[in-house]
């Protein structure tokens, strides 16, 4: 063996022994981000100063005070019938009392028994509590078929989101920080102590998250700058120069690399506080013939524009949406000792979200749910902290956790999901592009079928003491182990306020040893213990009244019947909409003003979507109302009158949920539908599965929400002098893009009525639909009867209204025979009922002229609507033919219409007014809002006129008819005695 070989052996031996020595040394274990030592929590920040947040600032009064028992001020005895007015009167009465030193006015006590509520109960003043006499003693049944939340704790939203303010100057404000610097000194006397900290969502941050694009090369669902801004609602606790101290921690770092942050001040005038609902059972009635019925109450309790409020010791049954929903404008809310049972709804998106928050500093503790969907859920950009403590979900249909975009500072503490998952992760395109759903959040002593804990860029998520299958690259510690303290939330609270919090915590004990090597004595004791029934959280919650007694005692308190109940004021009606002298009038006034269509596809729930949204009578967003959501129809009417709108033209939506906005034709793999929902006329059957993943439609039954909302608007229209233009059908579903037909209720795959259309669908070129001829074909007896029944529903729904104009359908370019059929059904219905609704003929010119040439059909027509044709500026007619199986815009692509002008609009309207003097004529064609004066001077109806027009001219025009002028620029209305002259050059009116 030569020297070189010897050296090689020696080096090899040295390396081996050195490696063994290194392996023999115990590796240094990284310090956990959080651990308990001698009963004290120890936090280890990262290199930027971020640490696990202190979640204990959640709940009523930031959990620093227990929920108080408030004195009863009025009693509502049980009586048969609708109790809405009596209970609401009691709530309003207490709301009118002066508040005490602690901000409370008093409690309304419901006695033992069942109260039927057909309307909605609203707590709108601070310091008001609604109290039952016990979960097993007092029940409110949300009766009827409406979807209103049963109870709302609701103030006014007077806080406007601002994009500017004082700039935070720190380069980096870490997670859990409670102070920062701003770019100028603040004198608190010059401002409110209430601030919003706005953290912008910048392009570079979105790109780093990978949230700009979720696949397919399509970025429509990707995040856009400004769409995921966070708004931390805080109170200033102290100011030192330009250093601001706040009352609760930040849960997402404020980093100048990603836009930093700014603050702005607000006044808290609109938000209410110190309100609660307690000690009661809330039940929704429902149609027992349909196990997935949705024409009943969706939410039991909504909390909106409120702080320091609560819901406690309540059992909920049969609600379709949420037991308790805390909206984004609420903070410091406690929901405790609540049980949600037997929800009734479809299985899918926006349903069965038993305990939901999009607010801040919300505490759900000791809450239990069965057969829900997202039972414990945190929503869109909830700024945190928010906490779920000692909660349990049994056999849900989907996961609990963060369900939308970037909720931060979420704690799941002693939470068990039996049969589904707990998830912190990236949802990608789900939930309309939710992407990263959560940041800087903790699972603590949780169990589930699976726990997902993923780490988003720029943030972290942590899981301690998890029992489950595991997934994710977040921080994991002590998996498959139960750790101390049992509850992180209450350990944090105890350390923060430095006092015993056991009375608030009420954590179920785990009293026995779990060693794998017990002594014989311990084994015997545990064997004996195992034979006993295990204590269940549901039972523990049911015993809450023994641990935290809510008083139902009262002395010298009157009942609401003794105090007095205000009588309902019957609304007054405007003069009836009718045709007088061939024009539409209400009383002695012409009906004039703008018309608005509805938004029948697209949309979302983000601020930009809401800002761009149009009115829609039958749009539905569970638990939320307002522009772009479930429209508040009173607000819509007020806005219409303020903006010179006289009518809404309504047609049903192109499809129900926003997933189909992608224009795919595919069958959805689940019912994870996205709001806002454009409700359709027909009811779901509760049977089988339609193309959108919910149950199939029953075309013989009608969606009560849809028709009730239309009826409500029609009633308001009759009270306020407005008009509903009701399009019976919507042709867009059966022509053009194949996706238009995919979820259509009439499609054979989507209903239980055997409509007989080809299935699979024969899409042209595998993407276009040409089903108009089949849809309008009346040779199929099943379809013919369904059409007849549906048309009668369109009429019957408004039988007691006068301000509704019925049209055959939006975009109708169909054949003559279907219009005849439509009119036959109307004539038959009119004969049966003695009612005479206003019927407008709104079709192509050839079909219009053919109908009007037939006296029997012309007699049914009240209004001629010029919509799908017009005279072009050169005098020729743009007049596509009916029944050619082309949509209006397809005709336009072929025929390339030219614009009309004042003269030609006048010509068209006058032509039909002269030929059919007893019928009103509307012009809804090319650029109709610009030619309202032409319509007026031609004797037409519902013109869009300048708001500056003299009312005396309109009143005088009522009895006049168009006459020919010798001056080409003058248009004349006359009654033979006096005249109104309009000069198209000067654009001025003159009376002679």
Regions found by a protein language model. Name each.
Residues 120-124, 137-155, 181, 265-270, ...:
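Glycine-rich beta-solenoid repeat tracts in large extracellular/virion proteins
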Residues 196, 646-651, 724-727, 804-808, ...:
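Structural recognition of the beta-strand scaffold that forms the well-ordered cores
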Residues 555-575, 889-992:
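Aromatic- and carboxylate-lined catalytic core of secreted/periplasmic carbohydrate-active enzymes
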Residues 585-851, 858-861:
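Active-site mouth of glycoside hydrolases
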Residues 817-926:
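Glycoside hydrolase catalytic-domain groove-lining segments
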């Amino acid at each position: 063996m030569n020297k070189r070989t010897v050296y090689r052996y020696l080096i090899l031996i040295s390396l081996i022994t050195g490696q063994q020595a290194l392996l023999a040394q115990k590796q240094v274990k990284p310090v956990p981000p959080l651990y308990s030592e001698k009963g004290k929590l120890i936090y280890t920040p990262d290199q930027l100063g971020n640490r696990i947040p202190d979640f204990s600032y959640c709940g009523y009064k930031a959990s620093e005070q227990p929920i108080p028992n408030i004195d009863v001020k009025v009693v509502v005895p049980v009586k048969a019938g609708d109790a809405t007015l009596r209970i609401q009167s009691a709530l309003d009465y207490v709301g009118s009392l002066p508040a005490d030193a602690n901000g409370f006015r008093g409690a309304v006590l419901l006695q033992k028994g069942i109260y039927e509520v057909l309307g909605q109960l609203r707590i709108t003043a601070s310091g008001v509590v609604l109290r039952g006499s016990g979960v097993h003693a007092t029940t409110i049944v949300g009766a009827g078929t409406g979807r209103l939340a049963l109870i709302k704790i609701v103030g006014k939203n007077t806080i406007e989101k601002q994009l500017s303010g004082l700039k935070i100057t720190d380069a980096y404000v870490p997670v859990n920080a409670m102070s920062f610097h701003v770019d100028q000194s603040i004198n608190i006397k010059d401002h409110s102590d209430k601030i919003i900290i706005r953290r912008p969502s910048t392009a570079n941050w979105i790109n780093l998250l990978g949230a700009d694009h979720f696949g397919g090369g399509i970025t429509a669902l990707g995040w856009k700058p400004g769409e995921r801004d966070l708004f931390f609602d805080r109170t200033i606790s102290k100011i030192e120069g330009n250093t601001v101290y706040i009352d609760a921690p930040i849960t997402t770092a404020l980093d100048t690399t990603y836009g930093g942050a700014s603050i702005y001040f607000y006044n808290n005038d609109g938000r209410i506080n110190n309100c609660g609902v307690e000690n009661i059972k809330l039940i929704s009635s429902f149609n027992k013939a349909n196990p997935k019925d949705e024409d009943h109450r969706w939410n039991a309790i909504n909390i909106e524009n409120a702080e320091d409020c609560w819901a406690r010791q309540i059992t909920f049954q049969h609600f379709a949406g949420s037991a308790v929903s805390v909206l984004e404008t609420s903070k410091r809310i406690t929901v405790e000792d609540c049980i949600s049972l037997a929800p009734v709804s479809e299985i899918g998106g926006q349903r069965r979200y038993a305990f939901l928050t999009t607010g801040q500093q919300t505490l759900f503790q000791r809450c239990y749910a069965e057969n829900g969907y997202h039972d414990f859920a945190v929503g869109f950009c909830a700024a945190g902290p928010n906490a779920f403590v000692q909660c349990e979900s049994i056999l849900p249909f989907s996961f609990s956790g963060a369900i939308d975009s970037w909720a931060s500072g979420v704690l799941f503490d002693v939470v068990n999901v039996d049969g589904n998952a707990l998830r912190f992760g990236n949802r990608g395109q789900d939930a309309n592009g939710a992407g990263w759903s959560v940041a800087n959040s903790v699972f603590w002593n949780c169990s589930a079928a699976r726990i997902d804990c993923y780490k988003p860029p720029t943030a972290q998520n942590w899981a301690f003491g998890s029992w489950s299958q595991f997934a994710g690259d977040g921080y994991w510690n002590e998996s498959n182990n139960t750790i101390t303290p049992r509850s992180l939330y209450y350990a944090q609270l105890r350390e923060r306020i430095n006092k015993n919090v056991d009375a608030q915590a009420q954590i179920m004990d785990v009293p026995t040893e779990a060693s794998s090597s017990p002594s014989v004595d311990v084994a015997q004791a545990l064997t004996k213990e195992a034979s006993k029934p295990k204590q269940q959280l549901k039972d523990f919650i049911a015993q809450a009244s023994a641990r935290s007694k809510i008083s139902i005692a009262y002395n010298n308190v009157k009942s609401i019947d003794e105090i007095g109940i205000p009588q309902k004021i019957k609304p007054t009606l405007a003069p009836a909409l009718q045709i007088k002298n061939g024009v539409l009038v209400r009383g002695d006034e012409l009906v004039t003003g703008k018309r608005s269509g509805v938004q029948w596809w697209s949309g979302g729930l983000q601020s930009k979507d809401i800002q761009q949204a149009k009115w829609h009578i039958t749009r539905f967003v569970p638990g939320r109302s307002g522009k772009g959501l479930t429209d508040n129809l009173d607000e819509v009417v007020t806005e219409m009158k303020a903006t010179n709108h006289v009518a809404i033209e309504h047609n049903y939506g192109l499809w129900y949920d926003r997933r189909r906005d992608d224009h795919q034709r595919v069958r959805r793999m689940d019912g994870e539908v996205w709001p806002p929902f454009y409700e359709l006329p027909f009811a779901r059957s509760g049977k089988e599965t339609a193309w959108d993943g919910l149950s199939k439609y029953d075309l013989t039954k009608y969606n009560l929400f849809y028709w009730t909302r239309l009826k409500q608007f029609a009633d308001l229209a009759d009270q306020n002098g407005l008009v509903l233009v009701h399009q019976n059908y919507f042709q867009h579903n059966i022509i053009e893009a194949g996706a238009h037909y995919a979820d259509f209720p009439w499609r054979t795959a989507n209903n239980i009525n055997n409509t007989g259309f080809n299935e699979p669908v024969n899409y042209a070129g595998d993407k276009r639909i040409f089903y108009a001829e089949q849809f309008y074909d009346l040779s199929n007896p099943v379809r013919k009867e369904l059409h007849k029944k549906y048309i009668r529903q369109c009429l019957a729904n408004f039988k007691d209204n006068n301000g509704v104009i019925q049209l055959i359908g939006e975009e109708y370019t169909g054949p003559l025979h279907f219009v005849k059929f439509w009119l036959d059904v109307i004539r038959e219905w009119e004969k049966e009922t003695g009612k005479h609704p206003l019927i407008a003929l709104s079709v192509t010119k050839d079909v219009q002229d053919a109908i009007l040439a037939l006296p029997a059909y012309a007699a049914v027509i009240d209004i001629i609507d010029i919509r799908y044709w017009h005279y072009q500026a050169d005098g020729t007619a743009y007049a596509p033919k009916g029944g050619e199986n082309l949509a209006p815009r397809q005709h336009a692509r072929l025929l390339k219409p030219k614009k009309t002008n004042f003269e030609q609009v006048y010509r068209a309207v006058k032509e039909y007014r002269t030929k059919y003097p007893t019928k009103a004529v509307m012009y809804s064609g090319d650029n109709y809002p610009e030619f309202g004066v032409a319509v007026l001077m031609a004797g037409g109806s519902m013109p869009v006129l300048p708001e500056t027009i003299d009312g005396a001219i309109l009143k005088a025009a009522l009895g006049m008819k168009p006459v020919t002028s010798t001056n080409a620029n003058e248009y004349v209305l006359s009654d033979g005695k006096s005249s109104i002259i309009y000069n198209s050059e000067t654009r001025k009116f003159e009376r002679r």
